[in-house]
Amino acid sequence: MWWRDLTRLRLWLKREAIPGEGRKAAKVNAGVGEKGIYTASSRGGPPSARSKAVTVVAEGAASRSWLSMDAPELGPGLVERLEQLATCPLCGGSFEDPVLLACEHSFCRACLARRWGTPPATGTEASPTACPCCGLPCPRRSLRSNVRLAVEVRISRELREKLAEPGARAGRRRGGRIPTMGCLDLPGEDMRKTWRRFEVPTSKSSNSEDDLPEDYPVVKKMLHRLTADLTLDPGTAHRRLLISADRRSVQLAPPGTPAPPDGPKRFDQLPAVLGAQGFGAGRHCWEVETADAASCRDSSGEDADDEESHYAVGAAGESVQRKGCVRLCPAGAVWAVEGRGGRLWALTAPEPTLLGGVEPPPRRIRVDLDWERGRVAFYDGRSLDLLYAFQAPGPLGERIFPLFCTCDPRAPLRIVPAES
């Protein structure tokens, strides 16, 4: 049950220190190792800005557990993602008394009341109400309290407060105790700058799940719970693409498959399909199970290697070009990564950017869309390592749809259902 997970996480948050009696001493190791030890020099920073990981051995009444806590894993990136998912798309602040609509979008109860206006008097005809994000009709009677989200908002706030404590970052002793969250920085401010500077593609070896605290999967599980439930829009699919009956997977149709009629919304050169759900506000995320390796960039007519599978996943604006050659870059209203030749590329302009350290590409890719901030970020769907992030100067300005491209008749791209 998720309440049991919540209890475990709250205990972890409160476990600031280990008392001297009945506990073993903490062991502090210099951050010069390979796996699980973060160093500034390993990310291109100066050797003098080395970080030290704190490893605490906690001996309980019935069992003994190791908690290896590496500061970057508990740093600003994780808390930022939690806060993004705990932010109301209408007011931009943390959810207050969140309510859930029939379309699965959540808002503050007061924010939604202001948007919809005062309910009509008894006996008068009610004006239609719709979701501010997706536009789907949502009657007032469909509102229900989102208790789970309210709990996750509180957890996000507690994590932020915990990391804001000076001792949690500097790793100084306080009253004979050693904080178990954070690292010993030399100097601490340099390491915080390093965190901000390196929110770019990172090596998987520096963000290994083996080095996370035992309760860290609880936080990751909550992030996965908020994944949007998507389907594909067959009306936008290239005529050579085959959409599954449940509209959750797409692959290149085998030869001889009857092609559907063309239409104004359908891609005619790029082997792509859009999601049926579009977003004009708020923060949304979805996961895609990818093919084995793979270039959709050759929609311009370049030859492709028949032995390779090719795919791209990401997001596209409503204005993306459907006919002719499509510009696969932010200037063409496309924010995507491409799997090709056993490597992963960010589709940037004028040339794609090879994402070093991402070999082979992850089997699951998580797309995080923050409409107001103009940010589209990509994560490993299992470890939540950041792969790449596109950043616009402001809000994206139009409805954004999930984008799926594939040139592979063998392995489909599949939307991972929410809660899986």
Curated annotation (Swiss-Prot):
Q: Which SMART domains match?
A: PRY (SM00589), RING (SM00184), SPRY (SM00449)
Q: Carries keyword Cell cycle?
A: no
Which molecular function term from Gene Ontology is one that the record holds?
zinc ion binding
Q: Where in the cell is it found?
A: Cytoplasm
User: What tissue specificity does the UniProt entry give?
Assistant: Expressed in testis.
Q: Give the UniProt keywords, A-Z.
A: Cytoplasm, Metal-binding, Transferase, Zinc, Zinc-finger
So what does this one do? Plays an inhibitory role in anti-RNA viral innate immunity by targeting the adapter DDX3X and promoting its 'Lys-48'-linked polyubiquitination. Alternatively, enhances the cGAS-STING pathway activation by promoting 'Lys-63'-linked ubiquitination of STING1, facilitating the STING1-TBK1 complex formation and STING1 activation. (Microbial infection) Plays a positive role in human immunodeficiency virus (HIV-1) replication.
Can you say what this protein is called?
RING finger protein 39
Q: What is the organism of origin for this protein?
A: Homo sapiens (Human)
Record gene name: RNF39
